[in-house]
Amino acid sequence: GTIVDQESYSEGDVDFKTQLTSILGKGPETVFCPNYYEEVGQILSQAESVGLNVPFLGGDGWDGLEGYATADQLKDSYFCANYAKGSSPEFEDAYKAEYGEDYPNGFAPLGYDAAKTVVYGVQAAEDAGLEAGTDEYKQAVNDAIASGTIEGITGTFTFDEHHDPVKKTAILTYVDGKPELKEMF
């Protein structure tokens, strides 16, 4: 594909019509919009009002967008996320039992996985019989996480040399305004 336009805005902006009109004038086939759901909802609404009716693509910040955009605005759009609803019914049921509501977005499963990762590292240091708070203990925690494989709610993952997780991502689309897993990639 070819990038036909690149636009930006400042933090706190709520009017995106100038940027969207510029994009529209370039005749795009799709728009990549890696923003958070509150802004994306405003952007999709304003895109519709200026006649920019193409699929939008986004990242994990879109998780929860269905509360901020209509089914028509979300039609044919895709986003990637760390978790797809239904991937772990046990986690979802436990979350609902604890908090009385469905999990709000992918941050809950990610938070669980972050805590599980720390516990994984601490357990390795404890199993080695090291004294908490020592440099050796801290190094054992770091080494275990860096070399381990974690079975998390968002999937199985390891960490690369930059300490970034290596794992699959969920590719989702919207069906009747609700996110639906298309594939794991």
Residue ranges: model-predicted function:
Residues 1-185:
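Extracytosolic ligand-binding ectodomains
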